Amino acid sequence: MNDPMLRLSDIHKSYNAGQAGEIRVLDGADFTVDRGEIVALVAPSGAGKSTLLHIAGLLDTADSGTVEIAGQPLQRASDAERTRTRRRSVGFVYQFHHLLPEFSARENIVLPQLANGMPNAQAVARADALLDKVDLAKRAGHRTAEMSGGEQQRVA
């Protein structure tokens, strides 16, 4: 059996809510995603889904517990290491995808790769391959503002 791509174990997270005191959002949460697995995280509003995903995506830190991406423990990683791992290994598709509407689908995919140090030709080739994979190769040069919501999600 392969190591999971993502493993969160015994995750605890609380927020200080001022006069209301401390609010415990996660209390011993466990979450595992195997490589290639598609997972839906479904729970009532306020249950801690976004907090759990922000911890999994290294956008937030747990008060305690273990966070591993591709077998690498990251709960004590430096900000720089968390940023490197997030850039290379983590992707989110938000309900609101935050694409740059004046840029093409290809440009929206190329820009973050350039920011991560990938050479332009390689970033363009990778963007084109990804667009082909999600059946948007013919729309690569179209501005995302001209695309449907579903097409925008696939670009994101």
Q: Language-model features: where?
A:
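ABC family nucleotide-binding domain
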Residues: 3-156
